[in-house]
Structures are given as structure tokens and as C-alpha cells.
């Protein structure tokens, strides 16, 4: 018989330990079953370290065999070592408790490798805190049931993976996970702020941003509004415009009205109440069944940096309830004729509730496209223009969103990552050109409507049209944000997910890829309106090998389509203000602030070497004071003193026009950004290399170039429809 090593216990101690362990197991198994298993599963989906949680929640004393102290902690995947009895000991017939002990020991010997596999797979559900979901709760619950995720409707002591807020980022204080709101988004999409952001882009790229009606901000631009309208009328007496007035913070059509004359008495009253935007009314909209309608399109802002944008393939079309007529003094007050807001038309006696997606006062956007297609309309061109509108609008919003984000979640501090579903309200003109009406930070996700049974008595009736669109948007947003989903680095072309283009064997593909590899990206861009595979096809491994069952095999294909960075090459040249925001944030100095102080502005001028004999530092101080004072007088936010981002942009425009003359504004601004980024990169490299004593030699950027893009290369000014409308 081989002698045991010195580390092993004597045989007598083994017998005593085994007997003691069996007795402990017999006593513990009576109280073990349901309560222990329940406790193990309560928080198995907690965010953080799932492996550690699962190991800690196992019963501590049940089935434990006394062993010497471990010399090292087991690594990931290492099995627990269970010492065996010496062969010389006679083995008795195991009793029920001892048999349970042996099974527990064997199971725990394999538990280490199983824990990691189970926690990374479908057994560990994603946890969602829905306690702040509010009106989107019903659609969220349906989505979570379809995804088989775990909901915590009353919150949770431990962190959740995802927090679903109904109003804003600040609905609750969270330090980890993901939240479905960006800080500052509610402020950014208000009528006044959105108009200012789009106006900056219109000054830089007037042709690209002609999808937003001409707007004036009240009360600060009232005199400008009156004078400009008067000037146009004098030049063209036949011009008889109509204007629509929208309160800054209004929603659901509240406070909106139409006017023909800038000196209308109602407009004078608005000037004394609250900020508002007055816009030129679109008089020739596309009509269906003689009714005006708009489109509510859902857009997912998945990430701010890097920028990721998704658009839902279907939306809602909301109809007026009175036949449309061009506005005149007799029908200006007919809100059911001119305003498409659902919250207004629902109170019309002509509102039609329908479970059909193609009839009624609320229909799916896809049904409208089918109807237009039957009349010969180029649907791909319509989608192309809508995609372009959405990307350009988000590009206009992201600079200030970055400032809000660094203020609420400064670099280096704990905080959640953010995503958000936005509601874009778009109107199709008679010539099928899309026009942006507004952007909603909190689009309604209700899947029911109120039905008045009797005066003052309402009943909530499910809306199948709302449920069809909104549940899909929420569910697929969660699928895209799934924190446990494995990120695959191999991206197969979308064409191979089409039912008509099944993935051939690898041997058959290799020869064709050698000849057609260069055209795969072109083929991919032409598959926007493709059909998707069946559940069985989605559950197959495209590499041809065996794989684990797809946890999403029971779900339909994702209804959200990525449009950025997919089309980044076509739109990156528009991101000039985004690059200015990066400069602005760099010189803020104090974490959490949103305004640039005078010292930070001077540091910006010095580090970028913008001062000269014609622009002294005294002139820089005067520039800062004048612009900051003017912007502080018109902005509502007075939390911090200093220069806001929009004031910094105005100062940047002034410096660019002063330094680079005889160029279009966007080229002047791009040249100045290049110069600033060059000097700052040189400064950063000097700080890194100064201790090494290495000389730094870099050539300054070339400023005289024909066209500038955000990546430093030229970009086309006109985007072809075929490049955007297909995937």
C-alpha cells in the first residue's frame, strides 16, 4: 500500500471527520430544501460579479469535508479538489444522509466550471428596474416577458443591469448599469434650444439643413421677426404666409396656435408669458384621404461617444380629423384640421379607433409607405431623405449633450452608461420632402387609449396599432443594450441573413469571396428593405459549426436599423460643432461645470496660439465679456456664471472669420479647428516627451483645401438616395 503524503491526515482523523460530516449533513438536510434554493436564486441576476455572487450564496456548512487550509485560491475553471479516503479503510454501505453528502460533494467538485458557464449564458437573466417607468410600464412588461428577463417593479437593493426611467435621467440616483435617458436631453429638444442648435448648423451648411422651417425665438427676436416678414412682403406682395406659434416647453399640442400677422394680439400676449418659437407654417403637406398627417418615428441614440444611431423600421402616422384646407382667416382656429397631435384629435368626434394598421386616425407608417408605393412613389428615396434628416438632427444635438454628460457624469467618477429613445415628428410635403416638426425626449409609449363610456367616465382600451410598434421598439432597444450579450467580432454581410441568400458552405464561399470581396460592401448597402430569416435560420451558426441554442431564436428580427456609424463617411464632415465642443470641454477646468470661465478662455487662446498683433489678449477679454453677457441675458439656465457652449461657438465663428478670410464659413471654421487641434496635439506630445529630451518635429496643417470633413478628408456635398435607403 502506498503511503500517503505528509499533508494527508491519519486514518483515524479521516474516519472521525467523515462521521462528523455525515452527522452534520443529516441535521442540515431537513431544513435545507426550499429555503436555501430560494435564497440562492433571489439575486442570481445581480449586476456586478455574478460568479462571486453565486459562489457566496451556496450553503456554507452543508456537505463540507474538513480539509487543510488551501495554499492558493482556485483560478477560473479550476475544479474543487476533494480528498478521498485511504484505500485501507473499509467502506460501509452509505446511509441516506451520507449518500446525499457524497452527491453534494461530487456536484460541488464540478460546480466551479459550471458556475462560470451558467452565469455567462441564458441562465443568468438581465435585471431591469421598472419602478420609474410610468406610462411606458405596460409596453416594458410585455417586452421583458418576451425577452425572458427579470423585472424589479419596486426597485432593488442590489444594482440592476438596466434602469428604465419614464421622464429624465435624474428620476433616481444610480451609479452603475445602464439608464434609458441622457442627462440634458429634455432641455436640448425643447423648441428654443433645438431651434438654436439647428440654426448654428444652418449657418454652416444651409443646403444640408433646409429640412427645418424658418424659425424665430420669442421674445428676443420679435422685432427681427416683424422686420423680416415686412421686408419679404414688400418685395413680394403676393406672399401671404401663415405662422405657427409653439411654446418652448409645451407638449401634446398645448398652447399651439396659428397667426397670419406678426402683430397679432395673441402673439403679443405670448411675449409676456413664456419663451416660444414662431415658425413659417407648411401650407402644402401631403394628404391621404384628404387629411393632413404626420409621422412619429422612433430613433435610438445608443451611444454618444462614439456616436451610434438606430432608426425603427416602422412608426406611427397620426391623422387630423377634419379635411385639410390651406389656412385662411376663417379656419385658423380649426385645430382638428391643422394640428396632427394625437392628444388633441382624440377629443374630436370624428376620431376613428381601429385595430387595423392601415385604417383609422392612427396607422402604421409602413401602411402609408405601402399605399404610396402602390401609386408609384419611390419609397427608397423617401427613406433616404428621412434617414438623412435624422442623422443631421442628432449631429446638431450631440455637442451640447456632451457638455451635459460630462457635467452629470464626469470622467473618473462612477456613473451609468446612457441610451435613449427619441420621438421624431416629421411632416411629408406634397413633393414628398420630409420636414422636421420637433423632437420628443419622452415619446409616449402607452399601448392603450381612453374611451369615454359616458360623460366623465373613461375606460382604457388596448390599442393594437400602438402595441405592434411600441413594444417592438422597446424590446429591440433592450436587445441592443443587453449587457450580457456576447460581442461577436466576426460580422457577416447582411445579405447572408436573407431568406433568398442562405449562407453556403465555407468551401463554396471561399472562391467567390476571392473575386467578389471588394463588392460585398456595395451589396450590403442595397439590402435595406430585405426580409429576414425564419427562427430556425436565426438559430443556425453561420460558420457551419455546432453552437449553443440562440436565446433570441423565439424573437422576431430586430426592428431597429443602424444608420450611424454605418453612414459616417457621408456625414462626418458635418460634425464641426462636435469638434468645437471637445475643445470647449477640454478648457472647462472644473469637473461638473457647463460654462467656461475667463481664465479657461484665455488658456484656450494661448494654447491654440490664436493671439497676434491684431488680436491682443485685452481684445480677447473684451470679446469674452461681450458675448458672455449677451448669451446670459437670453438663456434661462443661470446655475453657473461664464460662457456657455453656444456663446463659445459664436466666439469661435468670429475668430475663424477674422483669421481665414475669403472662404465660406464652414471652411473657415474647419480650418481654425484644424489649427487648434494641431497646436494642442503638439502641446500634449511635448508634455509626454519632455522628460526624454527628444526633439519634436511636426509640420503645421495645410489650411487651404477645397473641402473639409471631420476626418480630414473631402466629403461629398450631395448624398445619393441609393446610398442611404438600402442596407
Curated annotation (Swiss-Prot):
Catalyzed reactions per annotation: L-glutamyl-[protein] + L-glutamate + ATP = gamma-L-glutamyl-L-glutamyl-[protein] + ADP + phosphate + H(+); (L-glutamyl)(n)-gamma-L-glutamyl-L-glutamyl-[protein] + L-glutamate + ATP = (L-glutamyl)(n+1)-gamma-L-glutamyl-L-glutamyl-[protein] + ADP + phosphate + H(+)
Taxonomy, superkingdom: Eukaryota
Site (Essential for specifying alpha-elongation versus initiation step of the polyglutamylase activity): 252
Binding site for Mg(2+) 2: 438, 440
Intracellular or extracellular location(s): Cytoplasm, Cytoskeleton, Cilium basal body; Cytoplasm, Cytoskeleton
Tissue spec. comment: Highly expressed in brain, kidney, liver, lung, muscle and testis. Expressed in heart, spleen and trachea. In the brain, expressed in ependymal cilia, cortex, corpus callosum and striatum.
One GO process term, biological-process aspect: microtubule severing
Region feature c-MTBD region, mapped onto this chain: 464-566
Protein name: Tubulin polyglutamylase TTLL11
Residues involved in ATP binding: 246, 252-253, 279-282, 292-294, 340-341
Example of a GO MF term: protein-glutamic acid ligase activity, elongating
Region span, Disordered: 1-88, 530-551, 694-727
Biased composition regions of type Low complexity, renumbered to the chain: 17-34
Domain TTL, chain residue ranges per copy: 125-477
Binding-site residues, L-glutamate: 318, 342-343, 362, 470
Cofactors named for this entry: Mg(2+)
Sequence positions that bind Mg(2+) 1: 425, 438
Role according to the record: Polyglutamylase which modifies tubulin, generating polyglutamate side chains of variable lengths on the gamma-carboxyl group of specific glutamate residues within the C-terminal tail of tubulin. Preferentially mediates ATP-dependent polyglutamate long side-chain elongation over the initiation step of the polyglutamylation reaction. Preferentially modifies the alpha-tubulin tail over a beta-tail. Required for CCSAP localization to both spindle and cilia microtubules.
Domain notes: The flexible c-MTBD (cationic microtubule binding domain) region mediates binding to microtubules. It is positively charged and becomes ordered when bound to microtubules: it interacts with a negatively charged patch on tubulin. The presence of positive charges in the c-MTBD region is essential for proper binding.
Ranges of compositional bias, category Basic and acidic residues: 1-12, 49-63, 72-81
Organism in which the protein naturally occurs: Mus musculus
Family: Belongs to the tubulin--tyrosine ligase family.
Keywords: ATP-binding, Cell projection, Cilium, Cytoplasm, Cytoskeleton, Ligase, Magnesium, Metal-binding, Microtubule, Nucleotide-binding
Keyword Nucleotide-binding in annotation: yes
UniProt main location, coarse: cytoplasm
Binding annotation for a protein: 252
Amino acid at each position: 500500500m502506498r503511503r500517503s503524503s505528509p499533508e494527508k491526515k491519519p486514518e483515524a482523523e479521516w474516519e472521525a471527520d467523515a462521521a462528523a460530516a455525515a452527522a452534520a449533513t443529516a441535521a442540515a438536510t431537513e431544513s435545507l430544501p426550499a429555503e436555501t434554493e430560494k435564497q440562492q436564486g433571489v439575486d442570481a441576476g445581480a449586476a456586478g460579479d455574478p460568479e462571486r455572487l453565486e459562489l457566496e450564496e451556496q450553503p456554507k456548512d452543508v456537505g463540507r469535508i474538513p480539509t487543510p487550509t488551501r495554499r492558493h485560491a482556485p483560478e477560473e475553471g479550476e475544479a474543487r479538489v476533494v480528498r478521498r479516503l485511504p484505500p485501507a479503510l473499509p467502506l460501509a454501505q452509505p446511509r441516506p444522509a451520507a449518500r446525499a453528502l457524497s452527491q453534494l460533494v461530487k456536484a460541488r467538485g464540478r460546480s466551479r466550471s459550471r458556475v462560470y458557464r451558467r452565469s455567462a449564458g441564458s441562465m443568468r437573466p438581465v435585471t431591469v428596474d421598472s419602478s420609474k417607468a410610468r406610462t411606458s410600464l405596460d409596453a416594458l412588461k410585455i417586452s421583458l416577458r418576451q425577452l425572458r428577463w427579470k423585472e424589479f417593479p419596486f426597485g432593488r437593493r442590489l444594482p440592476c443591469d438596466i434602469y428604465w426611467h419614464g421622464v429624465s435621467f435624474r428620476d433616481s440616483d444610480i451609479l452603475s448599469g445602464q439608464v434609458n435617458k441622457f442627462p440634458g436631453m429634455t432641455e436640448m429638444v425643447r423648441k428654443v434650444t433645438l431651434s438654436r442648435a439647428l440654426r448654428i448648423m444652418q449657418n454652416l451648411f444651409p443646403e444640408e439643413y433646409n429640412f427645418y422651417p424658418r424659425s424665430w425665438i420669442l421674445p428676443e427676436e420679435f422685432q427681427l421677426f416683424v422686420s423680416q416678414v415686412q421686408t419679404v412682403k414688400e418685395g413680394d406682395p403676393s406672399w401671404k404666409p401663415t405662422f405657427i406659434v409653439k411654446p418652448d416647453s409645451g407638449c401634446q399640442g398645448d398652447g399651439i396656435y396659428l397667426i397670419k400677422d406678426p402683430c397679432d394680439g395673441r402673439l403679443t400676449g405670448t411675449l409676456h408669458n413664456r419663451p416660444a418659437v414662431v415658425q413659417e407654417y407648411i401650407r402644402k403637406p401631403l394628404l391621404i384621404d384628404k387629411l393632413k398627417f404626420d409621422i412619429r418615428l422612433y430613433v435610438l441614440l445608443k451611444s454618444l461617444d462614439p456616436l451610434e444611431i438606430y432608426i425603427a423600421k416602422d412608426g406611427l402616422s397620426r391623422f387630423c380629423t377634419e379635411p385639410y384646407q390651406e389656412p385662411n382667416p376663417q379656419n385658423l382656429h380649426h385645430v382638428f384640421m391643422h394640428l396632427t397631435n394625437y392628444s388633441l384629435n382624440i377629443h374630436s368626434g370624428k376620431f376613428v379607433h381601429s385595430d387595423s394598421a392601415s385604417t383609422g386616425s392612427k396607422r402604421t407608417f409602413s401602411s402609408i409607405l405601402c399605399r404610396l408605393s402602390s401609386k408609384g412613389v419611390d419609397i427608397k428615396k423617401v427613406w433616404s431623405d428621412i434617414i438623412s434628416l435624422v442623422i443631421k438632427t442628432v449631429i446638431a444635438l450631440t455637442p451640447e449633450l456632451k457638455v451635459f454628460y460630462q457635467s452629470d457624469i464626469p470622467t473618473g467618477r462612477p456613473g451609468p452608461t446612457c441610451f435613449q429613445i427619441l420621438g421624431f415628428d416629421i411632416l411629408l410635403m406634397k413633393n414628398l420632402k420630409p420636414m422636421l416638426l420637433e423632437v420628443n425626449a419622452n415619446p409616449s409609449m402607452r399601448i392603450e387609449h381612453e374611451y369615454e363610456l359616458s360623460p366623465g367616465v373613461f375606460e382604457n382600451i388596448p390599442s393594437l396599432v400602438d402595441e405592434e410598434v411600441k413594444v417592438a421598439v422597446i424590446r429591440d432597444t433592450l436587445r441592443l443594450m443587453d449587457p450580457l450579450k456576447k460581442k461577436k467580432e466576426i460580422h457577416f454581410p447582411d445579405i447572408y441573413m436573407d431568406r433568398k441568400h442562405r449562407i453556403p458552405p465555407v468551401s463554396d464561399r471561399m472562391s467567390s469571396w476571392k473575386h467578389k470581396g471588394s463588392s460585398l460592401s456595395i451589396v450590403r448597402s442595397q439590402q435595406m428593405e430585405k426580409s429576414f430569416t425564419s427562427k430556425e435560420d436565426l438559430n443556425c451558426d453561420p460558420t457551419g459549426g455546432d453552437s449553443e441554442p440562440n436565446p433570441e431564436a423565439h424573437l422576431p428580427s430586430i426592428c431597429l436599423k443602424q444608420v450611424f456609424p454605418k453612414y459616417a463617411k457621408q456625414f462626418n464632415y458635418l460634425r464641426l460643432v462636435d469638434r468645437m465642443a471637445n475643445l470647449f470641454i477640454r478648457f472647462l477646468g472644473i469637473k461638473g461645470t457647463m460654462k467656461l470661465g475667463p481664465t479657461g478662455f484665455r488658456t484656450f487662446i494661448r494654447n491654440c496660439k490664436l493671439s497676434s498683433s491684431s488680436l491682443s489678449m485685452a481684445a480677447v477679454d473684451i470679446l469674452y465679456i461681450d458675448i458672455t453677457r449677451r448669451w446670459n441675458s437670453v438663456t434661462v439656465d443661470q446655475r453657473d456664471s461664464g460662457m456657455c457652449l453656444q456663446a463659445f461657438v459664436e466666439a469661435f465663428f468670429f475668430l475663424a472669420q477674422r483669421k481665414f478670410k475669403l472662404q465660406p464659413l464652414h471652411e473657415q471654421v474647419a480650418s481654425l479647428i484644424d489649427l487648434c487641434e494641431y497646436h494642442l496635439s503638439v502641446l500634449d506630445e511635448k508634455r509626454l516627451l519632455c522628460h526624454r529630451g527628444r526633439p519634436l518635429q511636426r509640420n503645421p496643417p495645410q489650411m487651404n483645401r477645397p473641402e473639409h470633413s471631420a476626418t480630414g478628408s473631402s466629403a461629398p456635398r450631395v448624398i445619393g438616395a441609393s446610398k442611404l435607403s438600402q442596407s
